[in-house]
Amino acid sequence: MRLKLLWVGKTQESWVRTGIEEYAGRIRRYAPLEILEAREEKGAQAAAMRERECERLAKLIPKGGRLVLLDERGEAMTSPELASFLSKNRDQGTQDLVFAIGGAYGFTDAFRSQAFKSISLSRMTLTHQMVRVFLLEQIYRGFTIINGEPYHHE
């Protein structure tokens, strides 16, 4: 199973980039990982920005890819539940598991309708920059749980 992370806009803060690089490297010990950035839309009305950004994200999804949205309206999962989700997708032969983080205005309804699943990392509002690191850490944590490694503690 290949993992793809899609997000809108460049990573601004160097410390966020450092976190991304750290956890991406750890994840790659378990599965191929590709991170792709869609260009952020600027200077338009919120609905138009959301539409254009979702169009750009959609072009990055490989054919047959299983899309998982990171969305405040998504399902809350524990780390072991995410581990189980990763394991089931791997075992069922999912070729590309694609996680998408939207821009400041989120996703269009049309883009949401393409998703296999929608998950939320927190009921709190998080910056789109920090969600990148949090998601990568949780995916890494999931793989350590799957492999019975001493990273996650209950």
UniProtKB/Swiss-Prot annotation:
A Pfam family of this chain: SPOUT_MTase
Chief location category: cytoplasm
Catalysed reaction equations from the record: pseudouridine(1915) in 23S rRNA + S-adenosyl-L-methionine = N(3)-methylpseudouridine(1915) in 23S rRNA + S-adenosyl-L-homocysteine + H(+)
A single GO cellular-component term on record: cytoplasm
GO MF entries: rRNA (pseudouridine-N3-)-methyltransferase activity
Annotated EC: 2.1.1.177
Entry-linked CDD domains: RlmH-like
Keywords for this protein: Cytoplasm, Methyltransferase, rRNA processing, S-adenosyl-L-methionine, Transferase
UniProt: S-adenosyl-L-methionine binding residues: L70, G102, L121, S122, R123, M124, T125, L126
Localization annotation: Cytoplasm
Family according to the record: Belongs to the RNA methyltransferase RlmH family.
HAMAP family according to UniProt: 23SrRNA_methyltr_H (MF_00658)
PANTHER family linked to this entry: METHYLTRANSFERASE, RIBOSOMAL RNA LARGE SUBUNIT METHYLTRANSFERASE H
Subunit (UniProt): Homodimer.
Entry function: Specifically methylates the pseudouridine at position 1915 (m3Psi1915) in 23S rRNA.
Protein name (record): Ribosomal RNA large subunit methyltransferase H
